[in-house]
Amino acid sequence: HFRVRVMETGSMEGIVPAPLPLDILYEDEDILVLNKPADMPVHPSIGNYTNTLANAAAFYFQQKNELCPFRCINRLDRDTSGALILAKNALSAAILSAQMRNREIRRTYLAVVCGVTPPSGTVSAPIGRVSDSVIQRQVDPEHGESAVTHYERLAVRNDHSLLEIHLETGRTHQIRVHMGYIGHPLPADYLYHPVYD
């Protein structure tokens, strides 16, 4: 038996290490899986230079004397909590990215939505950017990219449904856009359903 170890030569250029708490779900020499809290951006952006998961990961790797560029395999919106997979080297990034592309990594979410949904369903509607917005997305049959969301209702309470959601695709804001599209937006979603009741 042979063992090959991939050594990384780069680091997280441009990402300022910040001593923020990390909830590590799993780690080995190739990957790091983190439990991302809600309200934490993944990448630095305008107004978020040192409070992101990337900053926390940079600090973590710096403390371990590991050179690991920030390679997120999956994406989560700022307000979404859940497992985020980081590849620690180019080989694991290539393998995991191929698995994502081939839909071999299953992404399942829990979400509360307004109203009582059917017991289960599939939303297959292309998603594209709203023309005058950098952030907002919409169902766009003409110019959008393919997007498929499966859901199963787990519970109903106070005219809200708890859903288990499985994504076939990973479009920006896919759950928020698709649930709103079928008339069951996420409550108090500041971008797609800014109604606070």
Task: Tell what function each PLM region has.
Residues 1-133:
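RNA pseudouridine synthases
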Residues 27, 116, 154-156, 189:
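Residue-level recognition of beta-strand microenvironments
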Residues 43-44, 87, 137-138, 163, ...:
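Thr-Gly-centered strand-to-loop micro-motif
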Residues 49-57, 158-197:
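Pseudouridine synthase
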Residues 62, 118-119, 132, 155-160, ...:
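Short, conserved beta-turn/loop elements at beta-strand boundaries and strand-helix junctions
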Residues 134-143:
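Short aromatic-glycine motifs in intrinsically disordered, low-complexity regions
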Residues 146-148:
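Short proline/glycine- and basic residue-enriched helix-capping loop/turn segments at helix->loop/beta transitions
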Residues 151:
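Long C-terminal interaction/binding lobes of large macromolecular proteins
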